[in-house]
Curated annotation (Swiss-Prot):
Motif Nuclear localization signal mapped to chain: 120-123
Protein name stated in the entry: Probable capsid protein
Job description of the protein: Self assembles to form an icosahedral capsid, about 50 nm in diameter, nm, composed of 420 subunits of the viral capsid protein. The capsid encapsulates the genomic dsDNA. Following virus entry into host cell, provides nuclear import of the viral genome. Virus particles do not enter the nucleus, but dock at the nuclear membrane through the interaction with host importins.
Zinc-finger keyword on record: yes
Protein family (similarity comment): Belongs to the caulimoviridae capsid protein family.
Organism expressing this protein natively: Carnation etched ring virus
Length: 494
């Protein structure tokens, strides 16, 4: 029987003592570490053999155990553990030691100790540069990655990924150890104990507080279904087909909408396309692979032709084969571009040394380059360049009125504001005056009309008008009127 199966079979008979808890910790180790610990740890084998009669000590340790007193080894280990613990007694420091330490610190701050240079010391070369790179490739450094802990994990997708990864790992452990987890009488108890050991926080409390042994079916499937219900709010058995259909619909839509515009982003595009391709059924792979080649710019057409010629019945389903053809065509284009760059730097004068001549003793004909005369154009012009208008815009033929200038006097239509010459009242003209028949001034106007004169529309200032009217009013005879008319005519000519 397997050594691990014996441990799980008698796990309930092992008392919970600090020395024997080591046996339970060994079961939670990785397979290589677990085998190494069970094969080379003599003390652990002795302790297990005292509790489990079926336990067999390996041959490599049986000879060694006969010549070594186990009690002496245990006592020596306890002494070493006690010596490794720090003592609680504090060392008494004298005042002279304190003064010496203080002076040393002051000297260090002033730079008096050691070299006086303020430069930072050079870093020593790393002699093991590749050690870190090698260690990165050796498994997971964190041993708690395979332990399920959903405390403060808020994202439902993260919770689902953690539960699925945990369930897949446990299923592999149970499948590879059937003697302990499948065919053993207490296989269900062993599985449950292993799941409790591989969980923390709220998941561990949920597993311990539920009566899983009273349920029918596989205990691992029941636990995973319970985790889906409690921490994701989903039915694990009922929603699997529904969620699978939704994922397929999203993947199909994304494959249609994906585009590649820059050929330098080919690897990211391929990764996204590949991750969604394998969510769909296999009978759709050939058409989706051709669709991938059609989305590739520059080299997609050549790669698709090669795919139709070279693809077999098996490789027609392979997206990796199509991606390989695309990379090969890209490599050809890159090599051609490198050659073109080299040809630009190639000196053509050396071609005559490699070619056989057709003429001997003839003068070489040099082709002259045709010269083109170009009219000199000064950089700066003295005159302003007048640009033609592209569209018609009417010019401005009127300028705004000057607010300071006096307004021209005229009688607008409607209400008249000019003053009458007969009655000297605003609101009407002299020919419309109601007092024109009785007024003496109207008679003077009639006399002026008889001499061929007519009234004008205020061409003079107010003072000149008043003076002219006064002269007309004061004249009582025709001779005086003639004199005033001659004076007014002379003023107009002036």
């Amino acid at each position: 029987m397997n050594r691990e199966a014996i441990l799980w079979k008698n796990i309930n008979s092992i008392p919970e003592e600090p020395d024997l808890i080591k046996s339970l910790e060994v079961l939670s180790m990785e397979q290589n570490d677990r085998e190494r610990e069970l094969e080379h740890n003599l003390i652990l084998n002795k302790q297990i053999s005292e509790q489990i009669p079926e336990w067999i000590i390996p041959d490599s340790l049986s000879e060694l155990s006969s010549g070594i007193d186990l009690n002496f080894v245990l006592e020596e280990q306890e002494v070493n553990d006690n010596n490794s613990q720090p003592s609680l007694e504090e060392e008494v420091v004298s005042e002279s030691d304190v003064e010496s330490m203080r002076s040393f610190n002051v000297a260090m701050n002033r730079g008096e100790v050691g070299e006086s240079s303020n430069k930072r010391p050079k870093r020593e070369p790393d002699l093991f540069t590749s050690f870190g790179k090698i260690r990165e490739d050796i498994g997971d450094k964190n041993p708690s990655l395979n332990i399920l802990n959903l405390d403060c994990v808020n994202s439902p997708s993260d919770r689902k990924n953690k539960i699925d990864k945990w369930a897949a790992e446990l299923g592999l452990v149970f499948l590879t150890n059937p003697e302990a987890y499948t065919t053993a009488p207490n296989a269900a108890r062993a599985r449950l104990a292993y799941m409790e050991h591989k969980s923390l926080g709220i998941v561990n409390r949920f597993i311990k507080s539920t009566q899983w042994t009273q349920m029918n079916g596989d205990i691992l499937l029941n636990v995973v279904s319970g985790l889906y219900t409690m921490f994701l709010g989903e039915d694990y058995t009922g929603n699997q087909e529904k969620t699978l259909e939704q994922e397929r619909a999203k993947a199909s839509l994304r494959l249609i909408n994906l585009q590649l515009c820059d050929i330098c982003s080919l690897q990211s595009f391929f990764c996204d396309y590949e991750s969604n391709l394998y969510k769909l059924p296999q009978n759709e792979y050939p058409s989706l692979v051709k669709q991938y080649l059609a989305k590739i710019p520059i080299v997609g057409e050549k790669a698709s032709k090669r795919f139709e010629e070279e693809a077999s019945a098996a490789t027609s389903y392979s997206l990796g084969f199509a991606h390989k053809l695309v990379n090969e065509e890209l490599a050809k284009i890159c090599e051609l571009s490198k050659k073109q760059k080299k040809l630009k730097r190639f000196n053509k004068n050396c071609c005559s040394t490699f070619e056989k001549p057709y003429e001997y003793g003839c003068k070489p004909s040099y082709s002259k380059k045709k010269k083109y005369s170009k009219k000199y154009k000064p950089k700066y012009t003295k005159y302003k360049v007048i640009r033609k208008k592209k569209k018609f815009s009417p010019g401005k033929y009127f300028k705004p009125k000057d607010k300071k200038s006096e307004k021209a006097k005229y009688c607008p239509k409607g209400k008249k504001t000019c003053r009458c010459w007969v009655c000297n009242i605003e609101g009407h003209y002299a020919n419309e005056c109601p007092n024109r028949q009785t007024s003496e001034k109207f008679k003077l106007i009639q006399i002026a009309e008889n001499y061929g004169l007519e009234p004008i529309e205020n061409p003079y200032e107010d003072q000149q008008e008043i003076c002219l009217l006064e002269q007309i009013q004061l004249s009582s005879s025709d001779s005086e009127l003639d004199d005033t008319c001659e004076e007014s005519s002379s003023e107009e000519s002036e």
